[in-house]
Amino acid sequence: MINSFIVIFLSFLIFINYANLVCVEATHVYGRRSHSNGMHGNGARRAVAVLRGDAGVSGIIYFQQGSGGSITTISGSVSGLTPGLHGFHVHQYGDQTNGCTSAGDHYNPFGKTHGGPNDRIKHIGDLGNIVAGANGVAEVYINSYDIKLRGPLSVIGHSLVVHANTDDLGQGTGNMREESLKTGNAGSRLACGVIGIAAVS
């Protein structure tokens, strides 16, 4: 009788120790998962796009969205540009097998026409223009409620593209009207990069 009790008691201790080990391992796995998803301790998420092109244009752009689906801040710089305005958009695909052409059209999950970033009717990927100074550098700082880093409309895995010309924000007229409602007449693609999850700093 005593021996049976001892066996049961030892079995119980072994079970408790095993359960504790499983909990510890689960905690470690969860921690690694959080870091790999670019999550900060406050629930913010961060992404990055490294822009490269054939015309000497390059840049690094960071995306950061707070917890709870709040506003996304887009910041960084692009160099090698001609002075002035340059169209700046998130495009459909994270594909650069044929250069920036492979990125496809503007990211437009709702099938709307092109517009400015503050317009009601626009593509999700319409970020308007960035402005390059006389030194060819554009300092980028954009706040957007449309750009998401989580959920079904996340831009992670899509491409960020900077264009040769000014985006007319869908306001083109005459023979420029049709293309204005598609691309903003922003011209060729100077540089692009896939938006990826950023390492947690």
Curated annotation (Swiss-Prot):
GO terms for cellular component: extracellular region. GO terms for molecular function: copper ion binding; superoxide dismutase activity. Its cofactor is Cu cation; Zn(2+). SUPFAM superfamilies: Cu,Zn superoxide dismutase-like. Transmembrane segments: none annotated. Its EC number is 1.15.1.1. It is an enzyme of class 1 (oxidoreductase). Residues 1-42 form the signal peptide. InterPro entries: SOD-like_Cu/Zn_dom_sf, SOD_Cu/Zn_/chaperone, SOD_Cu/Zn_BS, SOD_Cu_Zn_dom. Zn(2+) binds at H106, H114, H123, D126. Gene3D superfamilies: Superoxide dismutase, copper/zinc binding domain. It is found in: Secreted, Extracellular space. Destroys radicals which are normally produced within the cells and which are toxic to biological systems. May act in the parasite defense against phagocyte-generated reactive oxygen species. This is Extracellular superoxide dismutase [Cu-Zn]. It comes from Onchocerca volvulus.
